[in-house]
Structures are given as structure tokens and as C-alpha cells.
Amino acid sequence: MLEIHQFPCLSDNYGFLLHDPDSGETAAIDTPDGKEYLKQAKAKGWTITHIWNTHWHPDHAGGNKDIVEATGAKVIAPQEVEKLSGIDRVVGHGDTVDIGDFTADVIDVSGHTNGHIAYHLPEAGIAFVGDSVFALGCGRMFEGEPKQFWDSLSRIKALPPETMLYCAHEYTAANARFAVHADPENDALVAYVEEITAKRERDEPTVPTQLKRELATNPFLRADDPALVAKWGGDAPHETFAALRAGKDNF
């Protein structure tokens, strides 16, 4: 069985180490802070053998160099080679990546950046989604277009509903405030926000989050819902998504 070690990193990132006890392999999922990853791996008695980057932003790939120099880890990264260096294998939608006997499917989730990918391990029921989707939110649309981003979110929506989404940031409390503004009549959302508030008061993480719950509460995954279309407009889901994203940007 795969082991996941999650820890806070930088100001609001989460670090993830994915470990296969049988093979001894350990993957660093993104690298906000290489030294912190090495410290956490040492404390667990693990050696980082691979780095799986989701996109090029420094708070996701900035620690690659430190980890590679310390461990010789192999870097697996999306097709953003002009913005990343030292990549051992470039992967894109439809490719697979192995850790021990487990296989991760690479999914195109571009929109936040044009090469953003996620890693879905169906046998383990988990997905590492970077900044594509958050609990009650999604990433800013820095490089992509609304249709592109909505198509990416639709691929996430199509995963098994029990999938646990490992998002890269603790943004949930702020996302919750906009979600309630966007979808105030959603009873499931109101109940979820109460849980989130209690967790954050106890300084507990709200990540991972289950896809099933996000499908019922996350406005960015529900841009095809008639209630949100009526409130936010749009003749197609990606247009409603664009309105929601702009609303969040200015909230």
C-alpha cells in the first residue's frame, strides 16, 4: 500500500511525499522547498527517487535542484521545458508514470498554466492535482483560456467520485467565502463551510478533499449547473466558468 506524507511548506503550500514500501521508491510531488522535502524524507527514513512536477511555477518546481543534487532523483515534468530545466522525462496527457507496482495516469489539466498536468493513481484512489483545482476553488487562469480550463476541470469531474484530491495549497477558507457568495442556496456547501471553519480553527488541514464533495459544492466544478448558470450567465459552461473565475479574481 502506498504511503502519503503531507506537510506544510512555504506560507500556504502543502508538500507531498508518495512512498512505496515494497520498492522503496519515493516521489516528491512538486517541490516548493527542496530543503524541507529532504528534511521530511529523512525523518521518515525515505530517500526521494523521483520528482513529479505538475507545472513550472517556482512554488512547485523551485526545489528540484536541491533534491536532485542531494539524491540524484529523476525529474518527471510536463511539456513546459522552456520554463523548467533538468528534466529526465517529459510527460503529457495519456502517459503513465510508475512508482513500484502502482501506475499514475497523467491528465491534461491546463488552464492555470498551459502545460499543467495531474497524476491520478486509480488503484490508490488518489490524484495530485497541483493548482488546477482546490477545495471549493480552482487556480487562477494565468496562461490558459476559459474553454481550455473548463475542459480540464471536466476531466477531473470524470474521475471516480471517491477519488481523494491532493491540492497544493491551503486556500479553502478564502475559497469558501467566495463559494457561498457564488452559490448561496447550496445547503451542502453551507454544511461543508461549517466543517472547514471548525477544522481551520483547530489548525487542521482541509486537504485532501473528496471529489464527490467538490462536485456538490465547488462552484468552479458546477459551472454547468442551472442555478449557477442563471446567477452568473453564459450560453455554455465555459462561459459560466469564466464569469465565476472573474468574479473570484475581483472578490
Curated annotation (Swiss-Prot):
GO MF terms, alphabetically ordered: hydroxyacylglutathione hydrolase activity; metal ion binding
Pfam family, one: HAGH_C
Keywords: Hydrolase, Metal-binding, Zinc
The protein's required cofactors: Zn(2+)
Chain segments annotated as transmembrane: none
Pathway: Secondary metabolite metabolism; methylglyoxal degradation; (R)-lactate from methylglyoxal: step 2/2
GO biological process: methylglyoxal catabolic process to D-lactate via S-lactoyl-glutathione
SMART domains in the record: Lactamase_B
Binding positions for Zn(2+) 2 per the UniProt entry: D59, H60, D131, H169
Highest taxon of source: Bacteria
CDD domains found in the cross-reference section: hydroxyacylglutathione_hydrolase_MBL-fold
Keyword Metal-binding listed: yes
Top EC category: hydrolase
Annotated catalysed reactions: an S-(2-hydroxyacyl)glutathione + H2O = a 2-hydroxy carboxylate + glutathione + H(+)
EC numbers: 3.1.2.6
InterPro entries: Clx_II_MBL, Glyoxalase_II_hydrolase, HAGH_C, Hydroxyacylglutathione_Hdrlase, Metallo-B-lactamas, RibonucZ/Hydroxyglut_hydro
Cofactor, how bound (note): Binds 2 Zn(2+) ions per subunit.
Gene3D superfamilies cross-referenced by the UniProt entry: Ribonuclease Z/Hydroxyacylglutathione hydrolase-like
General function of this protein: Thiolesterase that catalyzes the hydrolysis of S-D-lactoyl-glutathione to form glutathione and D-lactic acid.
Subunit structure, interactors included: Monomer.
Entry's family note: Belongs to the metallo-beta-lactamase superfamily. Glyoxalase II family.
Protein name: Hydroxyacylglutathione hydrolase
Organism: Erythrobacter litoralis (strain HTCC2594)
Primary gene name: gloB
